[in-house]
Amino acid sequence: MRKINIFDTTLRDGEQSAGVNLNLHEKLEIARQLERLGVDIIEAGFPAASKGDFQAVQAIAQTVRNCSVTGLSRSVQSDIDAAWEALKDGAEPRLHVFIATSPIHMQYKLRMTPEQVVETAVESVRYAKKYFPIVQWSAEDACRSDLPFLATIVEKVIEAGANVINIPDTVGYITPKQYGDIFSFLKKNVRNIEKISLSAHCHDDLGMAVANSLAAIEAGATQIEGTINGIGERAGNAAIEEVAVALYIRKDYYQAETRLNLQEIKRTSSLVSKLTGMIVPANKAIVGKNAFAHESGIHQDGVLKEKTTYEIISPQLVGVQSNSMVLGKHSGRHAFRTRIQELGYSLTEEEVNRLFVRFKDLADKKKDITDDDLIALILDEKLDTYKNFYQLCSIQVQYGTNQIPTAVVVLKDGEGNDIQEAATGAGSVEALYNALEKALQLPVTLLDYRIESVGSGRDALAQVYVKVSLDRKEASGRGTAQDVLEASAKAYIHAVNRMFVIEKMKEEQALAAQ
């Protein structure tokens, strides 16, 4: 059975989703979980793009040991140099270098002739091989490229030393049969192609990213690129969990397999969703909350008699478990620490102590403490280690059916000064956000507001995700609390703080570049 490598680009292509801004600690947490999931390659970022990206790629390369870490690079020597500096301490450093090959990109974006593109591609691969034992070369917009030219440039970069050739459907344009035909054409018309690995990278603009990826495997691809939950620029990328489970369930047809630990899929999906603020649709294949739900009476009857009548995937296969109680208010520090370790999180003693206080506070208010509750606490506390410009001290909201909703908020700024403001609104959340905007004295615009429960029951935690903009800059934030309004206020302040952090990092990068 053929082995298919999984190349995860959640931290690079996935982070290009509108409104998603992950900090270093969040990227590290996702990278560790991807390692537990068992992906073969993690594309950690674009080292030359910014100081923040460089630091994240470097930190991930130094942390992850059970899979290869790579970074993206243009066909520019300075990009390749930056990538090597970021990746050189990794367990298996590799480079992903690209250049566009379609007529429209060469003419309008690169303003280069086909001959110049070939020369640049070859030079970049040769230069990269001085540093990297493994070099992956990508033909950006390959699916709108002239096939004879694509074959020519692929042959040249293989001669220059490329180990992996990636054929991206950059704009999600191709159909499964056409995509498979491209791989077949290259296998027939490129010398020495049997010496390298062929990779597929599909976008979902026409909803065919997973189908195209599977078609590429049928045509000989041995590496699939994608993201967790299919997140990414525009309509997203191929969802890794869908490709992997499809290969597992239909191994009779594809005769191919991955090394993924499928039971880590649900946990990985939930982590990425929580940190990016991109909620998984209920009907999403494999990881949506309705993926294993049966509403029809006929279906329910069949499943009760024999699960395989309608259930081709067992929930346990991908790590979906009943949300049972794990801890309570009488649980001690040792049990608390042990359960966190079992969930896959590594915490310092100081972090354990700080979280234990929050856990005890929650346990006094909430009867059953579930794994989802614990994970929400960890993410809420552990990952936001940067300096907060504003801190939420308290909120008070008055609301009645015949009253105008009124909110009072108290904040503390970065210098420790208290700020108190009050405002009204058409509803409780609007009153609260109007008060926060007055306190901040900033023209913050709310672009998106979403809420979901953590666990079930009337005492479930509320998790709120918001996206805000200020001066044409966007940032997302999240907040968790038993009270919806408190969670809403936390999410708003979290987003504003992140916006200031992002802006501060850009200023530092600009100064460093001078």
From Swiss-Prot:
Residues 4-266 form the Pyruvate carboxyltransferase domain. It holds the Pfam family HMGL-like. It is an enzyme of class 2 (transferase). CDD domains: DRE_TIM_IPMS (cd07940). It catalyses: 3-methyl-2-oxobutanoate + acetyl-CoA + H2O = (2S)-2-isopropylmalate + CoA + H(+). InterPro entries: 2-IPM_HCS-like (IPR050073), 2-isopropylmalate_synth_dimer (IPR013709), AIPM/Hcit_synth_CS (IPR002034), Aldolase_TIM (IPR013785), LeuA/HCS_post-cat (IPR054691), LeuA_allosteric_dom_sf (IPR036230), LeuA_bact_synth (IPR005671), PYR_CT (IPR000891). Pathway: Amino-acid biosynthesis; L-leucine biosynthesis; L-leucine from 3-methyl-2-oxobutanoate: step 1/4. Transmembrane segments: none annotated. PROSITE patterns: AIPM_HOMOCIT_SYNTH_1 (PS00815), AIPM_HOMOCIT_SYNTH_2 (PS00816), PYR_CT (PS50991). It is found in: Cytoplasm. GO terms for cellular component: cytoplasm. SUPFAM superfamilies: 2-isopropylmalate synthase LeuA, allosteric (dimerisation) domain (SSF110921), Aldolase (SSF51569). Keywords: Amino-acid biosynthesis, Branched-chain amino acid biosynthesis, Cytoplasm, Leucine biosynthesis, Manganese, Metal-binding, Transferase. Its EC number is 2.3.3.13. GO terms for biological process: L-leucine biosynthetic process. Residues 391-514 are annotated as: Regulatory domain. One of its GO terms (molecular function) is acetyl-CoA C-acetyltransferase activity. Mn(2+) binds at D13, H201, H203, N237. Its cofactor is Mn(2+). Belongs to the alpha-IPM synthase/homocitrate synthase family. LeuA type 1 subfamily. Homodimer. PANTHER family: 2-ISOPROPYLMALATE SYNTHASE 1, CHLOROPLASTIC-RELATED, HOMOCITRATE SYNTHASE-RELATED. NCBIfam families: leuA_bact, PRK00915.1-3, PRK00915.1-5. This is 2-isopropylmalate synthase.
